[in-house]
Amino acid sequence: MKEQKWIHEGLITESLPNGMFRVRLDNEDMILGYVSGKIRRSFIRILPGDRVKIEVSRYDSTRGRIIYRLRNKDSKD
């Protein structure tokens, strides 16, 4: 049976080494996020200030996998 995961939206606050980021969720929790394989392979650039969707395990709510970078309204990408 596949593990159930929560999907949250948040804001990247800090960039850490090896594709890790500190993310502030919309409910004001701070968690550690890492980049998923598809984002890494597609060379999608994630910078502090970006809004992302993050997948969090029910068993460890302090870490999550960044699965999508949301488009900013003011950027031209």
Swiss-Prot record:
The segment(s) forming the S1-like domain are 1-71
State if Coiled coil is listed as a keyword: no
Give the keywords, sorted: Chloroplast, Initiation factor, Plastid, Protein biosynthesis, RNA-binding, rRNA-binding
- Superkingdom, taxonomy of origin: Eukaryota
Q: Name one GO cellular component term.
A: cytosol
Extract the GO molecular function terms from the UniProt entry: ribosome binding; rRNA binding; translation initiation factor activity
Compartment(s) where it occurs, according to its Swiss-Prot or TrEMBL record: Plastid, Chloroplast
Please name one Pfam family that this protein belongs to.
Answer: eIF-1a
The cross-references to CDD domains, in alphabetical order and at most eight, read: S1_IF1 (cd04451)
* InterPro entries, A to Z: NA-bd_OB-fold, RNA-binding_domain_S1_IF1, S1_domain, TIF_IF1
Q: Indicate the quaternary assembly.
A: Component of the 30S ribosomal translation pre-initiation complex which assembles on the 30S ribosome in the order IF-2 and IF-3, IF-1 and N-formylmethionyl-tRNA(fMet); mRNA recruitment can occur at any time during PIC assembly.
Which family does the UniProt entry place this protein in? Belongs to the IF-1 family.
Q: What does this protein do?
A: One of the essential components for the initiation of protein synthesis. Stabilizes the binding of IF-2 and IF-3 on the 30S subunit to which N-formylmethionyl-tRNA(fMet) subsequently binds. Helps modulate mRNA selection, yielding the 30S pre-initiation complex (PIC). Upon addition of the 50S ribosomal subunit IF-1, IF-2 and IF-3 are released leaving the mature 70S translation initiation complex.
Kindly give the HAMAP family that the UniProt entry links to this protein: IF_1 (MF_00075)
Name of the protein in question: Translation initiation factor IF-1, chloroplastic
Native organism is: Sambucus canadensis (American elderberry)
